[in-house]
A protein has these predicted regions:
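Conserved SAM/SAH-binding loop
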Residues: 210-215, 225-227, 246-248
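Conserved S-adenosyl-L-methionine
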Residues: 163-164, 243-245
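Active-site or ligand-binding cleft "flap/edge" segments
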Residues: 220-229, 236
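N-terminal signal-anchor transmembrane helix specifying type II single-pass membrane topology
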Residues: 1-48
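N-terminal accessory regions of S-adenosyl-L-methionine
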Residues: 29-128, 132-139
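SAM cofactor-binding core of SAM-dependent methyltransferases
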Residues: 104-221
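Alpha-helix termini
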Residues: 132-151, 230-235, 260-271
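Conserved acidic-Pro-Pro-aromatic motif
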Residues: 179-181, 232-242, 248-352
């Protein structure tokens, strides 16, 4: 009886384990007995299947918008010198921003970070960033030396912020919600971060009173640095999040950045910008003067080079302050975009 009972119990246990193993499935949808052993024998797919499928749908939507962009541009007789804000609506029912819609959908959550008005930003995959483990504590020496890069430069989530102007609600919330976040800030017009960042979090930030520019002019007043030079100074090869609002200087500054990585193997891939995502405010004139530095042709070539190097428009928010403030009303010449790097091989967004 004892032997018989023991045998029945063992048989039931074996059957139970088999059923549990049967319902354990891997990312590709196949089943495996003892899945922990079978999965350890091969690397997981990258990105996961569900994520690749969502990204493929986004890429398809974006490519369609690129085709429509070309057709719409060809329909205007002044192409490539198309006015930013045509006055004949019946003939040309579009503005500059309609050529560059946010057609690439973030496959993760999209959350507002920072205040709801000017200064706050939309972030693709905020929950992914929140889930990242906190890096090792920063040494006391690194905290004291504020004109030196933070120790263990690339540990944690690396954020660069250009154009602070005394408003740091975005940075403050990122520090509060993302334990791994480390932020490097630059602005030649202010002396430091806004009051929104509490002193208890300042040890995770670094500030330098310089501007972001096309050329390195470190001895000028004010001083300007290029983005590649700042990354080298900080011992960085990759930026997870780039926030940039530099009042029209973004075109030349990002040209220099693209020059540094076009045709080069970076942390993200060949001819791919080593940035996970970008929150940027774009500034334009009215686009109707021969003296303007950025016209439609210049803007489109600049934009499409960014796309070629991985960037995809995932969010757009028209800044209406120029339209609504004051007595001298203006066209909507400033617009916030979120670009997500769809080609980036290093982004934490594609590993979840």
């Amino acid at each position: 009886m004892i032997r018989s009972s023991t045998g029945r119990v063992a048989a039931i246990a074996i059957i139970f384990l088999f059923i549990v193993a049967l319902f354990q499935n891997n990312d590709t949808g196949t089943y495996a007995f003892l899945p922990s052993l079978s999965q350890s024998s091969k690397l997981p797919s990258y990105p996961p299947t569900w994520l690749r499928e969502r990204m493929a749908l986004s890429e398809k939507s974006w490519k369609k918008s690129v085709e429509l962009r070309e057709k719409m541009a060809q329909s205007h007789p002044a192409n490539p010198k198309i006015p930013f804000f045509p006055t004949d609506f019946l003939k040309y029912p579009f503005t500059i921003w309609d050529f560059f819609p946010a057609t690439w959908t973030c496959p993760h959550d999209f959350q507002r970070v920072g205040r709801l008005g000017d200064g706050g930003k939309w972030v693709c995959g905020m929950s992914i960033y929140e889930s990242l483990p906190e890096p090792k504590p920063i040494s006391a020496e690194a905290v004291e030396v504020r004109e030196a890069a933070i120790a263990a430069a690339e540990s944690g989530l690396v954020i660069y912020s250009f154009g602070i102007n005394g408003e740091s609600s975005f940075e403050a919330e990122m520090l509060e919600r993302v334990p791994s976040a480390r932020i490097w800030g630059y602005d030649f017009s202010v002396d430091g971060w806004g009051k929104q960042i509490p002193m208890t979090e300042r040890h995770r930030t670094f500030f330098k009173k310089v501007g972001l520019g096309k050329d390195d002019e470190h001895d000028a007043s004010p001083a300007f640095w290029t983005l590649p030079a700042l990354m080298k100074e900080n011992n960085h090869t990759y930026i997870d999040i780039l926030k940039i609002d530099i009042e029209g200087s973004e075109y030349d500054a990002l040209d220099t950045f693209m020059d540094a990585f076009d045709g080069i193997q970076s942390a993200s891939g060949k001819s791919v910008l080593p940035i996970g995502q970008v929150m940027i405010e774009l500034h334009l004139g009215n686009g109707d003067s021969a003296n303007e530095k950025v016209d439609f042709d210049r803007f489109r070539k600049w934009w499409e080079r960014l796309e070629r190097m991985g960037m995809r428009p995932a969010w757009i928010e028209i800044n209406l302050f120029a339209v609504t403030l004051g007595s001298n009303k203006s066209n909507p010449r400033c617009t916030e975009y979120v670009w997500v790097n769809a080609k980036d091989e290093r982004s934490v967004l594609w590993k979840q």
